[in-house]
Curated annotation (Swiss-Prot):
Residues 37-191 form the SIS domain. Its main location: cytoplasm. GO terms for cellular component: cytosol. Catalyzes the isomerization of sedoheptulose 7-phosphate in D-glycero-D-manno-heptose 7-phosphate. SUPFAM superfamilies: SIS domain (SSF53697). CDD domains: SIS_GmhA. The reaction produces a racemic mixture of D-glycero-alpha-D-manno-heptose 7-phosphate and D-glycero-beta-D-manno-heptose 7-phosphate. The gene is gmhA. This is Phosphoheptose isomerase.
Length: 191
């Protein structure tokens, strides 16, 4: 009954991934992001990750696989998702939702740390403010975006952009693949 729809959805997902894969710049940016994070870890730094909605879940997944494990057993790495419900609700109430990530970066981030922000549109105001706060602290920044990069285009030290202009879920599907590869490369760099 839905077989044509299922095939169509999977074909579109494969096409979006193939388009991303066909640009060597994207491959180089993934490697650059992994090296940036591994270099921070080697110097005693940490990575703070953030996103909204599904990207928030991806930010938590990224941090969890750094502190826990990906494919192999190894020491945990200092990854923190900005996801504490009490922090998010406090800052949203007292300052506004645009500040939920930047306030955390201001409080916990340090020179040499890395901010890892995810926004499928590249226009999330709270991620933009987090990038500003991170730069003010001397942190490096990585942005996973989509479409044309939105307002984040060119702001981060490393931007990995999925150039898809359809629904955000296709961008998120590639983002999770990128996250897994970055973790794999970090593990190789740290071995």
């Amino acid at each position: 009954m839905y077989q044509d729809l299922i095939r169509s959805e999977l074909t579109e997902a494969a096409d979006v991934l193939q388009k991303f894969l066909s640009d060597d710049h994207n491959i180089a940016q993934i490697e650059a992001a992994a090296k940036l994070i591994a270099d921070s870890f080697k110097q005693g730094g940490k990575v703070l990750s953030c996103g909204n909605g599904g990207s928030h879940c991806d930010a938590m997944h990224f941090a969890e696989e750094l502190t826990g494990r990906y494919r192999e057993n190894r020491p945990g790495y200092p990854g923190i998702a900005i996801s504490d419900p009490s922090h998010l609700s406090c800052v949203s109430n007292d300052f506004g939702y645009d500040y939920v990530f930047s306030r955390y970066v201001e409080a916990v981030g340090a020179k040499g740390d890395v901010l890892f922000g995810l926004s499928t549109s590249g226009n999330s105001g709270n991620i933009l403010k987090a990038i500003e706060a991170a730069k003010a602290k001397g942190m490096k920044t990585i942005a996973l975006t989509g479409k044309d990069g939105g307002k984040m285009a060119g702001l981060a030290d490393v931007e990995i952009r999925v150039p898809h202009f359809g629904y955000a879920d296709r961008i998120q599907e590639v983002h999770i693949k990128i996250i897994h590869i970055i973790i794999q490369l970090i593990e190789k760099e740290m071995a």
